[in-house]
């Protein structure tokens, strides 16, 4: 087997084949992915710079947005440059340990994105249900601790992915029909029993997804009750409009995630493998691409921040929570 050493069934490297069955069209497939990646990097880095530069945006909501942007740009950067090397230069080899590292960061950052969306829902809950205590509840230390706790949660849950994958013997070859090192795609290359990998992967996906979605659902239930109790229609519209960008991000992220998750596990045999691979890439690229667009279009404070950033002190705005 290519990549074997004499004393172990662990390969020295894997071969990422890209999109199986569509090798002849790799160049054309790469174009929309490259375009989306550029938008994601420019948009999210722009948001981070804007929030760090504009003192008026130094509020909990925008700190969480900056954390989401950092997570998004890091997530797509872990897989898109390598994918483009496969598509453009036919550089398909990836070192075994590099593959495990990519696997860890892809899954950890995916969980991190879900966790940050959950924190943003809690932020909106505090802002709308406890507006007078908003600044005293969500202080900078609290925000930092919440972000750190979310990060550590995902690190601790995803580390076993690499350990479980590393223990498997690889005697069937080292060719992976994918554009990046996904946990189960790598495990299925092995000639060992990867049932533990499958069970643990399902458990982690459900644990992170169910917990975060429950927190988001409870937060928005309380928000809806608080908004509906307001006497003024204008006040209800103003309060709920602060949540629209976040709700759009939730829909984009979780619809893509659940589509990938359920089609892969329950109707996978009825869907061609190349469709799975393309959807898996879109699942990782679509939220980072769309989030800065959604927040730029839907959030008045971001629009005003961009204008002020470009024009300097010539204009001034009043920012709400």
Curated annotation (Swiss-Prot):
Odorant receptor. One of its GO terms (molecular function) is G protein-coupled receptor activity. Disulfide bonds join 99-191. It holds the Pfam family 7tm_4. PANTHER family: OLFACTORY RECEPTOR 52N2, OLFACTORY RECEPTOR 56B1-RELATED. Residues 1-27, 78-101, 163-198, 261-276 are extracellular. This is Olfactory receptor 52N2. It is a multi-pass membrane protein. The gene is OR52N2. Keywords: Cell membrane, Disulfide bond, G-protein coupled receptor, Glycoprotein, Membrane, Olfaction, Receptor, Sensory transduction, Transducer, Transmembrane, Transmembrane helix. The keyword Disulfide bond applies. It comes from the Eukaryota. GO terms for cellular component: plasma membrane. It comes from Homo sapiens (Human). The chain crosses the membrane at residues 28-48, 57-77, 102-122, 142-162, 199-219, 240-260, 277-297. Glycans are attached at residue 5. InterPro entries: GPCR_Rhodpsn (IPR000276), GPCR_Rhodpsn_7TM (IPR017452), Olfact_rcpt (IPR000725), OR51/52/56-like (IPR050402). Its main location: membrane. Residues 49-56, 123-141, 220-239, 298-321 are cytoplasmic. It is found in: Cell membrane.
